[in-house]
From Swiss-Prot:
Name of the protein in question: 3-hydroxyacyl-[acyl-carrier-protein] dehydratase FabZ
Class in the EC hierarchy, top level: lyase
Pfam families registered for this protein in UniProt: FabA
CDD domains: FabZ
InterPro entries reported for this sequence: FabA_FabZ (IPR013114), FabZ (IPR010084), HotDog_dom_sf (IPR029069)
Annotated SUPFAM superfamilies: Thioesterase/thiol ester dehydrase-isomerase (SSF54637)
Originating species: Mannheimia succiniciproducens (strain KCTC 0769BP / MBEL55E)
Annotated catalysed reactions: a (3R)-hydroxyacyl-[ACP] = a (2E)-enoyl-[ACP] + H2O
EC number: 4.2.1.59
Length: 150
């Protein structure tokens, strides 16, 4: 990943909501801090003590469910896809698959989940990515993901 001394490409929350169909409580990307079309994207999600999932996962010891970390990576992947391709009306990028998901540390209230996705390959409307979610530079989750354009 290189930015070649260019200004960061930022996507604010209001634009994220024009690109992704997700809404509270399932909009899991707060801000994109940089990206390179067709290559990679860096974003983050601030984890609040008020996340709805914490009422049951787990009472008294809240931990962000791994499936929501994967969904945040998938939404980051979708944002990169939307910023890379010219979109026809009503077209979406669907989460199509996941491989080799690994969870390495818990994500807790107060953490800032840093999201990084990078394109591996693209063919026939299917794009493969690697995704890494980290907190304070420590990997929390990594996986290979796929999305399909429909």
């Amino acid at each position: 990943m290189t930015t070649e001394n260019r200004p960061a490409k930022i996507i604010e929350a209001h634009e994220i909501m024009t690109l992704l169909p997700h809404r509270y409580p399932f909009l899991l990307v707060d801000r994109v801090v940089d990206f390179e079309e067709g290559q990679w994207l860096k974003a983050y999600k601030n984890i609040s003590v008020n996340e709805p999932c914490f009422t049951g996962h787990f009472p008294g010891q809240p931990i962000l469910p791994g499936v929501l970390i994967l969904e945040a990576l998938a939404q980051s992947m979708g944002l990169l896809a939307f910023k890379t391709h010219e979109i026809k009306g009503g077209e979406l990028f669907y989460f199509a698959g996941i491989d080799d998901a690994r969870f390495k540390r818990p994500v807790l209230p107060g953490d800032r989940l840093e999201l990084f996705v990078e394109v591996i390959k693209e063919r026939r409307g299917i794009t493969s990515f690697t995704g890494v979610a980290s907190v304070d530079g420590e990997v929390a989750c990594e996986a290979k993901l796929m999305c399909a354009r429909r």
